[in-house]
Amino acid sequence: MALLWLLSVFLLVPGTQGAKDGDMRLVNGASASEGRVEIFYRGRWGTVCDNLWNLLDAHVVCRALGYENATQALSRAAFGPGKGPIMLDEVECTGNESSLANCSSLGWMVSHCGHEKDAGVVCSNDSRGIHILDLSGELPDALGQIFDSQQDCDLFIQVTGQGHGDLSLCAHTLILRTNPEAQALWQVVGSSVIMRVDAECMPVVRDFLRYFYSRRIEVSMSSVKCLHKLASAYGATELQGYCGRLFVTLLPQDPTFHTPLELYEYAQATGDSVLEDLCVQFLAWNFEPLTQAEAWLSVPNALIQALLPKSELAVSSELDLLKAVDQWSTATGASHGDVERLVEQIRFPMMLPQELFELQFNLSLYQGHQALFQRKTMEALEFHTVPLKVLAKYRSLNLTEDVYKPRLYTSSTWSSLLMAGAWSTQSYKYRQFYTYNYGSQSRYSSYQNFQTPQHPSFLFKDKLISWSATYLPTIQSCWNYGFSCTSDELPVLGLTTSSYSDPTIGYENKALILCGGYSVVDVTTFIGSKAPIPGTQETNSSKTPSLFPCASGAFSSFRVVIRPFYLTNSTDTE
């Protein structure tokens, strides 16, 4: 009776003011029954793209607003272009949904069009004669309060933390039965259930159970792994999927790298190959700061073995990579076999002869693996001192192998930093979190002239090639620097050279996309003289978004990396 009384009291509570996610409205029409379609999400209104827009989609809008049906589904900003984000694109409804938010689409704020394609509708003037008082917005909080009260329960839950203390809670089967995600609990036989939970996840169990009532939960960087684990174990598929998508968002938000490392171990333990690949990719792009962090010495051997073969591994130089491996293996007491496998992945030809010579004096690993180092050094010295034509004639070296190609070397020898705009104090502080530096060129410029060697071989040490790198945010800036751009590709990065290039050398140049001045969230390739800049949620462009979202909403800077390699099919080698 107390439960029914509480629910009846809830129905008398006035609704809160303001729109809710999924609410819709019509704007800029000649009457209330027509206009540009706008939908509310995360505190603001935005428009809907007309891709795939049809009468079924329009019916959903009109019926939700109290009209009988839609008479027209209009496209091409028939009621004028809107402002703000484009909330939905490629919407496909059956016509029976309560909101466009419940229809199939590309997802919130993922769009391939601009406001010139805003969707509109014309609804029938006759309303259904129905007036709706909707207080349902208060229901999640009211149900959550029922769980918080821990009274009048008919299901008792004993949560055991595997020797780290138990937790006694209770629930209401009547409410749980309304939520398909709670089946694992309400289908139990009897009035009690035991939940066995990892000790580290005990603090989030109460929030997890409350979610079955309110269908709302706050997920943080510290709780996402446990909530994903609980959702997976108890069949809460919506929560499981939500947490899975959040992993990609949370990876760049921890400058200590504890979260990416924990998620990597979790992915391995659960067999989640997608999450594992994401963790490896993020750590490869941010390898340099990882080696400077306290967490470096706790990186598992399997992860380092997965990182070292990658060409898209961002580090100041190959020598610094080897020194980091030396530090890690010494501190962790890695086995002889593990060290040998790691050293085999080092690209010795990417180190200069002087650096190779000094390894025997400066590297702890050298004496224990002397034969391996000597063999690798001799192979590298051949690469540095023998011209390509002679190597091709007398050696069966496969110069297309990764060992003869550079990684993403971020030192000033091979790269230059471009700013997207004014350098903020906050970004500078973030970059000083670690002692490494991304270069000493003018940090405040969106245009850089710099020089690099033509090739990593010592034969080209004094043969420099000049580059000009530019951040191009507008058509006018493209014209100013001699680039041909379209509005769809802006902003874009430009890279040109005014120097003669050896016909036996090719370039696969890259751009590191930085968020907050310190975290690499994507890497793009220069095709010709331009490299695309990914889209962000804030810009809401038709561009593919960065692999890892930028929490600040805009990219702070870009590191242009020059990557030369031998063209083994060049006629000059014959």
Swiss-Prot record:
Q: List the disulfide bonds.
A: 49-113, 62-123, 93-103
CC annotations in GO? extracellular space; membrane
Q: Which Pfam families does the annotation name?
A: BACK (PF07707), SRCR (PF00530)
Residue ranges of domain BTB in the record: 153-221
Q: In which tissues is it expressed?
A: Detected in thyroid (at protein level).
Task: Supply the InterPro entries for this chain.
Answer: BACK, BTB-POZ/Galectin-3-binding, BTB/POZ_dom, SKP1/BTB/POZ_sf, SRCR, SRCR-like_dom_sf
Domain (BACK): residue spans on this chain: 260-360
Name assigned to this protein: Galectin-3-binding protein
Q: What organism does this protein naturally occur in?
A: Rattus norvegicus
